[in-house]
């Protein structure tokens, strides 16, 4: 199986051409045309414009991935003790690390990290197609952040970008992290970018 599904087409243009392209691509790969993480407004539009053509199911296995932003930003409580430990190790190794929003001035460094991240996994032939398409998607998202209404942040340590995160609002109350990349060999890098991105979004959009 190539993947579990695809995302709902972005933008405000007509849906039919985009859905036709997704359906043709799925047929080429011999997999069902499945869209994931459909929001209520997206479902309403699909039902309105394509009545009876889509079946909708709850994905209960994915519910664990919806978190309260305060929980991610503050990491309080016993259950998150291990995450705090990872961050403590990171702080010890990189006492002068900093978080920066992704801008035109530093986006090239994020692209460099993505290329290094993908190159380190290049030998995995079984997942080569998925890895390639993911890399293309990340690069496109970084280049088109403004057009896609995405927000991004990065972690800089020892004058090098070692982690970044990209996401967007799917509803006024829900921010979806689309991509989160870090050097896995650096303990705490993923945990720190996850926490700092949550803090950044919470501070920028307090309502």
Where are these regions (language model features)?
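Acyltransferase donor/substrate-recognition loop-hinge adjacent to the catalytic core
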Residues: 52-126
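A structural signal for short, well-ordered beta-strand segments and their strand-loop junctions
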Residues: 32-38, 66, 98-103, 154
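Glycine/small-residue-rich hydrophobic helix-like segments
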Residues: 140-204
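Short, intrinsically disordered, charge-balanced linker/junction segments flanking boundaries
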Residues: 93, 202-207
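A generic secondary-structure signal
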Residues: 21-25, 89, 116, 141-144, ...
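Short, glycine/charge-rich beta-strand/loop segments that flank catalytic centers
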Residues: 31-49, 60-63
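Short, conserved active-site entrance elements at the starts or edges of catalytic domains
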Residues: 105, 109-160
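Conserved donor-binding loop and adjoining core beta-sheet/short helix segment
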Residues: 1-41, 156-185
